[in-house]
């Protein structure tokens, strides 16, 4: 991969100032103060909120505590979506800090998966990585790794260790020089305006004539509603990690540098904010 290490670092160390508030109907023994945290964009809510859980459990009776879940403005937050994706999709136009409501009862079974332990997060994360490598390298790279390499990827994410994670992850970002890119680009496109969870299709980074496909090419093919058919300009905000890449950006470069740790490009299509 081309080595723009500063970009990789900026993506990894992206943070969202967040204020956690206990839901008003939760029963407490004394007033629950809000809890503030800088959330890592690349991580998962249930992986980085142990301190939040402990903070609010201190003011609650044990019998009133069941599985923790989070909500933003009435929308339950999916723990298996990366934090940065959740923010971009639901709250990118709101003022900071991001205000998240904490619940300990009435788990929304229809909207959320249960997260009984960090093992569930690890299993989901590794499943995504394996799917991404199946698309990129027919699973050859991830299958040639040892179990300790898989563990190092997970521990790097869990403990927020950039160098530990990228020492292994860089192997997943390589490809034969003669091929100009991966076999297919692992991506998921999310929209708030549809019930469909996300769009995911097979898409090659290089066209048959050898030209590099761009972000604009991807959107025209798999999500044409995001692009104006007349001039090819964006009709919506197209966001990855809180930024709007130019439509001319090669998809291969984006995949190498702006993928989340699960090796997917998580792309949010958001209506343009109205003044």
Curated annotation (Swiss-Prot):
Annotated InterPro entries: Atg5, ATG5_HBR, Atg5_HR, ATG5_UblA, Atg5_UblA_dom_sf, ATG5_UblB
Biological process per Gene Ontology, one example term: regulation of cilium assembly
Residues recorded with modification N-acetylmethionine: 1
GO MF: Atg8-family ligase activity
Tissue specificity annotation: Ubiquitous. The mRNA is present at similar levels in viable and apoptotic cells, whereas the protein is dramatically highly expressed in apoptotic cells.
Post-translational modification as stated in the protein's UniProt record: Conjugated to ATG12; which is essential for autophagy, but is not required for association with isolation membrane. Acetylated by EP300.
Effect of residue 58 to M: In a colorectal cancer sample; somatic mutation
Subcellular location: Cytoplasm; Preautophagosomal structure membrane
Topology class, membrane: Peripheral membrane protein
Induction annotation: By apoptotic stimuli.
Signal peptide feature range: none
Cross-link annotation Glycyl lysine isopeptide (Lys-Gly) (interchain with G-Cter in ATG12), location: 130
GO cellular component terms listed in the entry, alphabetical order: Atg12-Atg5-Atg16 complex; autophagosome; axon; axoneme; cytoplasm; cytosol; glutamatergic synapse; membrane
The keyword Acetylation is assigned to this record: yes
Entry keyword Mitochondrion: no
Annotated family: Belongs to the ATG5 family.
Disease per UniProt entry: Spinocerebellar ataxia, autosomal recessive, 25: A form of spinocerebellar ataxia, a clinically and genetically heterogeneous group of cerebellar disorders due to degeneration of the cerebellum with variable involvement of the brainstem and spinal cord. SCAR25 patients manifest delayed psychomotor development with delayed walking, truncal ataxia, dysmetria, and nystagmus, Cerebellar hypoplasia is seen on brain imaging.
Role noted for this protein: Involved in autophagic vesicle formation. Conjugation with ATG12, through a ubiquitin-like conjugating system involving ATG7 as an E1-like activating enzyme and ATG10 as an E2-like conjugating enzyme, is essential for its function. The ATG12-ATG5 conjugate acts as an E3-like enzyme which is required for lipidation of ATG8 family proteins and their association to the vesicle membranes. Involved in mitochondrial quality control after oxidative damage, and in subsequent cellular longevity. May play an important role in the apoptotic process, possibly within the modified cytoskeleton. Its expression is a relatively late event in the apoptotic process, occurring downstream of caspase activity. Plays a crucial role in IFN-gamma-induced autophagic cell death by interacting with FADD.
Subunit structure and binding partners: Forms a conjugate with ATG12. Part of the minor complex composed of 4 sets of ATG12-ATG5 and ATG16L1 (400 kDa); this complex interacts with ATG3 leading to disruption of ATG7 interaction and promotion of ATG8-like proteins lipidation. Forms an 800-kDa complex composed of ATG12-ATG5 and ATG16L2. The ATG12-ATG5 conjugate interacts with RAB33A; this interaction is bridged by ATG16L1 and promotes ATG12-ATG5-ATG16L1 complex recruitment to phagophores. Interacts with TECPR1; the interaction is direct and does not take place when ATG16L1 is associated with the ATG5-ATG12 conjugate.
Name the record gives this protein: Autophagy protein 5
Gene responsible for this protein: ATG5
């Amino acid at each position: 991969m081309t080595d723009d290490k500063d970009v990789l670092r900026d993506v990894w160390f992206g943070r969202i100032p967040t204020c956690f508030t206990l839901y008003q109907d939760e029963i407490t023994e004394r007033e629950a103060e809000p809890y503030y945290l800088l959330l890592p964009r690349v991580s998962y809510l249930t992986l980085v909120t142990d301190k939040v859980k402990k903070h609010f459990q201190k003011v609650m009776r044990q019998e009133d505590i069941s599985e923790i879940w989070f909500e933003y403005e009435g929308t339950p937050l999916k723990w298996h979506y990366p934090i940065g994706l959740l923010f971009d999709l639901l709250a990118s136009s709101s003022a900071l800090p991001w205000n998240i409501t904490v619940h300990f009862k009435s788990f929304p079974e229809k909207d959320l998966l249960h997260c009984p332990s960090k093992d569930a997060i690890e299993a989901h994360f590794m499943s995504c990585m394996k799917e991404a490598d199946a698309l990129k390298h027919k699973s050859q790279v991830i299958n040639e790794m040892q179990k300790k390499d898989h563990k190092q990827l997970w521990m790097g994410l869990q403990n927020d260790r950039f160098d530990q994670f990228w020492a292994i992850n860089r192997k997943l970002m390589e490809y034969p020089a003669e091929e100009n890119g991966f076999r297919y680009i692992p991506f998921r496109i999310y929209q708030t305006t549809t019930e469909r969870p996300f769009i995911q299709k097979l898409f090659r980074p290089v066209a048959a004539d050898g030209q590099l496909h761009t972000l604009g090419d991807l959107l025209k093919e798999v999500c044409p509603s995001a692009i104006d058919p007349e001039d090819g300009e964006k009709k919506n905000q197209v966001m990855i990690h809180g930024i709007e890449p130019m439509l001319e950006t090669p998809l291969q470069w984006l995949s190498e540098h702006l993928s989340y740790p699960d090796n997917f490009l998580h792309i949010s299509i958001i209506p343009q904010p109205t003044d």
